[in-house]
């Protein structure tokens, strides 16, 4: 598959399907309310009761965090035997974390931001890198710690790989 074809598969599920940012616990949906700025209550819940969702649950409920979105992407990519990695970005100065996914196609590394309701200017657009080192260097140059967490994510458990950075 070409980069364009792969991105279209991912966008069809996550970009065009009305996903919301948040999570589900015991059938209850939790979403941040940003009307008054940062939602402290949601943040507290996301660091205490949130557990990584199964990609099938995320696709059924149409709600997920950045972790859940990249797991859906990986699940779809695995169906097409497309190699991918999940990365944790940590901005020390702002004490913020974000998980993203890259995949390999046409001898390139591709990053496609599909976290629901992302305010990033590149939401839904692919960024193509010549190789993994170019991708890593861009984030390191911009002050991020970046870690491969592909094998650290456990469905049904809290995202300890992420929470450890915030504590």
PLM regions: where:
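A structural boundary/capping signal
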Residues: 1-167
């Amino acid at each position: 598959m070409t980069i364009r074809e792969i991105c279209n598969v991912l966008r069809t599920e996550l970009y065009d399907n009305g996903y919301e940012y948040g999570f589900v616990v015991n059938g209850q949906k939790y979403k941040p309310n940003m009307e008054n700025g940062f939602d402290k209550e949601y943040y507290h819940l996301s660091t205490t009761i949130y557990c990584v969702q199964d990609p099938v649950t995320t696709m059924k409920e149409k709600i997920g965090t950045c972790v859940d979105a990249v797991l859906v992407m990986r699940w779809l990519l695995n169906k097409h035997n497309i190699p991918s990695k999940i990365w944790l970005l940590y901005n020390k100065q702002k004490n913020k974390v974000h998980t993203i996914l890259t995949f390999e196609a046409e001898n390139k590394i591709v990053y496609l931001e599909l976290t629901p309701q992302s305010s990033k200017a590149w939401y839904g657009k692919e960024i193509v890198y010549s190789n993994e080192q170019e991708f890593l260097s861009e984030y390191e140059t911009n002050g991020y710690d970046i870690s491969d967490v592909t094998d650290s994510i456990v469905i049904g458990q809290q995202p300890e790989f992420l929470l450890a950075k915030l504590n």
